[in-house]
Amino acid sequence: VVQSFQNCMRENDIAPEDVVFVAHSTTQATNAFIEGDVANVGVVGVAGGGLEGFLAKRQLALKDIVLDEKVGRMIKVFNTFIKKKMLTEEVINKNIDDLISQGAQVIVASMAFGVDSMDEEMMIHDCAEKKNVPVSMASDITKLYGLTRRTRTAAINASILPKMMATANATESS
């Protein structure tokens, strides 16, 4: 991990003082995750039609992610699905608004075969970003094939985004 950070800093001409907040915010986000201080996640799933869409819709519909069964800590997950041919800014914005009205605080964009083309996930990302809603793209988080696994990984990551960003911003402004 250290070698990766050093390579990244060297290759991108990043000064060490510019990265201090990353470690702190990541630690705080990890602590928040362990303690269950996580954001509710809205998943915007996308797939083509026919059998692909039928199967993907089921794989994209995540259940709440249990963090600690004994005390009931979980990541609350809300789901919506858009057929690829219906994917427009207007439709995306309506679906994001619906997820937010249900209680989602962050958005995950996930598409069947998204690792092969991230364009559709990027459309969702851009719409959420314009609304100032934290967003994570499943295919950007992991290149694993396996729609449910990729989406779940992105949902877990997205659930700690608000805490991580708040800590990073607080650290940077101090």
Protein language model annotation of sequence segments:
Residues 1-174:
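N-terminally biased helix-coil "hinge/interface" segments that flank
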